[in-house]
Amino acid sequence: EGDVIQHWIYLKQKNEDSSKKKDNIPAEYKEIMALFAEFMKEAPKDPGLGISKKAKVILSPSGYVYLDHKYLEPSADSTQNAEQERLGMAAYEKQTIQEMYDWDPMTFNPTVENPQKDVAGIEAAIWCETITNFRDLQFLLMPRLAGVAEKGWSKVENTHWDEYKVRLGAQAPLWE
């Protein structure tokens, strides 16, 4: 009782060429990566198992709240093109701000049958693989961190992209 587990595995498959990704794995790691992939297939069951033992779940799905993703859309500020190319983990699919915002913590994992009771919260992560200074960190955090906060603190029925993007634009001067 009182335990908390983190659920960070994100296994949603998009329209991507997984064989191309496999081709990029160095030969000496292919066997271990195949074992890792097989092991990770069981991860979606983890929250339900934890809940059955009275643990609460912190949702931290890498596909939505891992802030080291490269940006998909171009920056409105052309001086940021070099940062956009350099920063972010290349192994992760590039994503738009909207893609990282549009998820529902209450329906993310079907093994969490009573999310109001069993989800302790959400968590964003950044591992800084490509970050060399504070400016780099800010570039990857903003504006995505604001979306993570809103998803964590608001009822999902109050989080709509068309309304959020207006609020988000108004916050931009605060990040200068």
Model-assigned labels for residue ranges:
Residues 1-176:
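Substrate-binding groove of N-acetylhexosamine-processing glycoside hydrolases
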